[in-house]
Amino acid sequence: MKLILLIIAAYLLGSIPTGLWIGKYFYGKNLRDYGSGNMGTTNTFRVLGPKAGLLTFTVDFLKGTLATLLPMWLGVTHISPLLFGFFAILGHTFPIFANFKGGKAVATSAGILLGFAPFYLIFLLFIFFFTLYLTSMISLSSVIAASIAIITVLIFPALHFLLKDYDFLFVLIVISAGSLIIIRHRENLVRIKNKTESLVPFGLNITKQKTH
């Protein structure tokens, strides 16, 4: 029973539509009606500004971390904490509190890694921010970091680099979350191809997108 309750709690925690609620209750704006219509960090940053964007990222990030750590704090050790983190990702992507139309799972997935493999997270964050500096695009940085995660989660354990051993559930969740992130960015990839993707106000914009 405790296991079922924790899975439900992880899903409900992930379902909290941070950006949507911040926009509605503090800015009087429905993010669905602005920008890309997404309630994640990128659109929140673009529509509501850096403070709201940073707050959205932080809360969405911590949803993944809390969902991963809470079972361990409650003494549930016979099940991998990653299972609960995965349900937080599902909640974030398909939130019951927002008509099952959620974010792209980047921040929440990163939060899970903080609770389970922090040094691996640092590696992926380096990839993300380095790509962000080169391209000025959060979307492309997210896709590249997700792609690198899918590749390295299969390679690093064999090299005993950052990931000591193969954990089947960890590999499965990283591949699943990474694939979900890439799929959720399909429209962004089309805009990148057309050179019309939105940019952050810094970086080199090496792909020469036309919008700022």
Swiss-Prot record:
PANTHER family: GLYCEROL-3-PHOSPHATE ACYLTRANSFERASE-RELATED, INNER MEMBRANE PROTEIN YGIH. Keywords: Cell membrane, Lipid biosynthesis, Lipid metabolism, Membrane, Phospholipid biosynthesis, Phospholipid metabolism, Transferase, Transmembrane, Transmembrane helix. Its EC number is 2.3.1.275. Probably interacts with PlsX. Pathway: Lipid metabolism; phospholipid metabolism. Catalyzes the transfer of an acyl group from acyl-phosphate (acyl-PO(4)) to glycerol-3-phosphate (G3P) to form lysophosphatidic acid (LPA). This enzyme utilizes acyl-phosphate as fatty acyl donor, but not acyl-CoA or acyl-ACP. InterPro entries: G3P_acylTferase_PlsY. One of its GO terms (molecular function) is acyl-phosphate glycerol-3-phosphate acyltransferase activity. The chain crosses the membrane at residues 3-23, 69-89, 110-130, 143-163, 165-185. Belongs to the PlsY family. The gene is plsY. GO terms for biological process: phospholipid biosynthetic process. It is found in: Cell membrane. HAMAP family: PlsY. GO terms for cellular component: plasma membrane. It catalyses: an acyl phosphate + sn-glycerol 3-phosphate = a 1-acyl-sn-glycero-3-phosphate + phosphate. Its main location: membrane. This is Glycerol-3-phosphate acyltransferase. It is a multi-pass membrane protein.
